[in-house]
Amino acid sequence: MASTFLSSIGQQFEGLKIDGDQVWLRPPRASDYEGWHQVRSDSRAFLVPWEPTWPSDVLTRASFRRRLKRYARDVRDDAGYSFFVFRRGDGALVGGVNLSHVHRGVSQSCSMGYWMGENYARQGLMTDAVQAVVAFCF
């Protein structure tokens, strides 16, 4: 991509892939539900201390579809961009990175949040993912 993310992203987002050394990132898709459900379910106790309260239906397919709709609305409004993180080699979904509160103009800024499945933590995968997203953005 010739321009940086914070300059312009538009309709190019849907097919986007960001490469790191150990991971690659792309926007979430409906077909990611099983992998997302598995890693989030397996990591629930690990993630709960760091995240807002989990509603009782948070891991359902319907909830995942609502999440994807919210992500699409954020992209349409140029307000936020979400990525799933996949491990190189086996393609396992290991976490997610979210860019939110996107501000255009002079400041060209955003906030970043992330989550990592417990079985993939402390291996440098999220560090690699964050570095790849930062390089992509700026």
Model-derived features with residue positions:
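GNAT-family acyltransferases
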Residues: 1-119
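Conserved acetyl-CoA-binding loop-helix of GNAT-fold acetyltransferases
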Residues: 115, 122-136
